[in-house]
Amino acid sequence: MAHLSDLDIANQSELKPIGEIAEKAGIPADALEQYGHYKAKIDINQIKPKDNKGKVVLVTAMSPTPAGEGKSTVTVGLSDAFNELKKNVMVALREPALGPTFGIKGGATGGGYAQVLPMEDINLHFNGDFHAITTANNALSAFIDNHIHQGNELGIDVRRVEWKRVLDMNDRALRHVNVGLGGPTNGVPREDGFNITVASEVMAILCLARNINDLKEKISRITIGYTRDRKPVTVADLKVEGALAMILKDAIKPNLVQTIEGTPALVHGGPFANIAHGCNSILATETARDLADIVVTEAGFGSDLGAEKFIDIKAREAGFEPSAVVLVATVRALKMHGGVAKDDLKEENVEAVKAGIVNLERHVNNIRKFGVEPVIALNAFIHDTDAETEAVKAWAKENNVRIALTEVWEKGGKGGVELANQVLEVIEQPNDFKFLYDLDQSLEEKIETIVKDIYGGSSVTFSKKAKKQLKEFTDNGWGQYPICMAKTQYSFSDDATALGAPTDFDITIRELEAKTGAGFIVALTGAIMTMPGLPKKPAALNMDVTEDGHAVGLF
């Protein structure tokens, strides 16, 4: 039987006017800034904070296959399932990046009958947030180069400008560039480079800011580079934090859309979890908590990346904790971690499923280290067999792990009711929530804690450059910041081919980046890139637009 594509399902769905969705969510009319019929921004100053805020349900996953395991789909479907159960719920998601949409994964608004809409708009330009973030980032680059050109009063060392330009595109050719060429009138020549917009510190700041003043304060703390005597230079030194915050004055407002089943959805911010902190904005999550009793949100990739950063960076900054954690698993990912080649994942292989459970088991144990009991959402795919599914359920029962077969892709909210009921039971129980590390530990200790306790590694090797940076950053007063690991999403290690649950491995930290505006230190491992490239056959090859302006090929 042929299944409709995600885009076909989205196009056949009947959207409600965004005013109706806002009314359902309890958003007052004067807080709604409409972008057409089905999208809006929310003026958070018009939302009345409530004392008894909604509970946060975090959705994370096991180590994924390149195609992803349907974490966004489960997040959306779970919110619709709570809606089925007549719960006051909102879903809070990240915005998709445009670059990867044309790369491997295609769109990122859920799938099947568990999607946020309007899917085309959200996956392409949405309400312009990423463009504003890109503009603010690159305006800062222009201000830096202009300052150097106009006499360099601050004494910025052109060899030590840390700030890079960004673009919301996968474009490997821009990783390393030279700027200021062509003679004295074109500026001072120096090496530069581009990151993808989702790796920009401006993106991280937007997602961690509590209000416009906090946004401005965080922007002012950005370290753009160093003087010739190695003193940090900040945006405050350039006196442009006001201008940059002004560019972001609308982007900071959360975006309101809806699921196929009419559940209110806040989609705002979009840092990657392998090269950034991987969570939607604090503002969107907190706004949802002021409006709903349950807020379902997600953090990128596996629990070793997104969930760890959600807890140790976002939740710590925002001052809340997850009341439940959903761990998305799939039969195909289990088979991959059990040794099955990518091209054979559709074939039944119960033994490989059992062998791959070691990966899922480590993710379960990792969530428990934060004092929260996980619920496994076994996300159903059409090629799964009963024997494979039962093997996972049997393991979960034997090891006292909550599990629910989740069929939201095919059935929408009704396919997630079992999962929702299990999550409700966890929410009602007390937990022993705790962070993985204390901020007063050294940067080195915090990195080692993540590697040993979450990844299962035995040691950390710091490159000569990273060792030097550890001392410099600590001397600069940045030792109290949390850590944001930049690591492959496919393995617990820094080797993407080491699947399953590797042990006794060493992780190499090749360099550190001080994100003093966002308030964390990025530790770069392996060959991780902050500007991705496109695959040999990008998803763009299957995309088109019809004569009447409808997108084709957005999955």
Swiss-Prot record:
Its EC number is 6.3.4.3. ATP binds at T65, P66, A67, G68, E69, G70, K71, S72. It is an enzyme of class 6 (ligase). InterPro entries: Formate_THF_ligase, Formate_THF_ligase_CS, P-loop_NTPase. The keyword Amino-acid biosynthesis does not apply. GO terms for biological process: tetrahydrofolate interconversion. Pathway: One-carbon metabolism; tetrahydrofolate interconversion. It catalyses: (6S)-5,6,7,8-tetrahydrofolate + formate + ATP = (6R)-10-formyltetrahydrofolate + ADP + phosphate. One of its GO terms (molecular function) is formate-tetrahydrofolate ligase activity. Signal peptide: none annotated. The keyword ATP-binding applies. Keywords: ATP-binding, Ligase, Nucleotide-binding, One-carbon metabolism. HAMAP family: FTHFS. Belongs to the formate--tetrahydrofolate ligase family. This is Formate--tetrahydrofolate ligase.
